[in-house]
């Protein structure tokens, strides 16, 4: 399991710890990842995703998982999230035609 957010693509960065004497030692900056269950309104299902805390705030800000995925570009999404996005697009298109 890699340390990458499934919704934003946020991953591990590397850098230096810098002491007061300006000594540098390598370190890793890890993303704040959480296992969360998000509900898709269009598909009426729950999905368990590994997302960063910042992505979770963005999902809430945009109005839920469906709205976030529809607005997100496919390049930053994981393969699971891309598949989920395509299913949501298909379901909303079917609902628009039926209405």
Swiss-Prot record:
Enumerate the InterPro entries for this protein.
Answer: Ribosomal_bL28, Ribosomal_bL28/bL31-like_sf, Ribosomal_bL28_bact-type, Ribosomal_bL28_sf
> Which GO cellular component term is one of those annotated?
cytosolic large ribosomal subunit
Pfam annotation, one family:
Ribosomal_L28
One of the entry's Gene Ontology molecular-function terms is: structural constituent of ribosome
Annotated GO biological processes are:
translation
Which keywords has UniProt assigned to this entry?
Ribonucleoprotein, Ribosomal protein
Q: Known PANTHER family for this protein?
A: 39S RIBOSOMAL PROTEIN L28, MITOCHONDRIAL, LARGE RIBOSOMAL SUBUNIT PROTEIN BL28M
So what family is this one in? Belongs to the bacterial ribosomal protein bL28 family.
Q: What is this protein called?
A: Large ribosomal subunit protein bL28
Task: Report the source organism.
Answer: Rhizobium leguminosarum bv. trifolii (strain WSM2304)
């Amino acid at each position: 399991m890699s340390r990458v957010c499934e919704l934003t693509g946020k991953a591990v960065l590397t850098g230096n710890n810098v002491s007061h004497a300006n000594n540098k030692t390598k370190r890793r900056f890890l993303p704040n990842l959480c296992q969360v269950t998000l509900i898709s309104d269009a598909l009426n299902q729950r999905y368990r995703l590994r997302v960063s805390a910042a992505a979770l705030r963005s999902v809430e800000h945009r109005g839920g998982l469906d709205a976030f995925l529809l607005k997100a570009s496919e390049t930053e999404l994981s393969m699971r999230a891309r598949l989920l996005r395509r299913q949501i697009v298909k379901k909303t298109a079917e609902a628009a035609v039926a209405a």
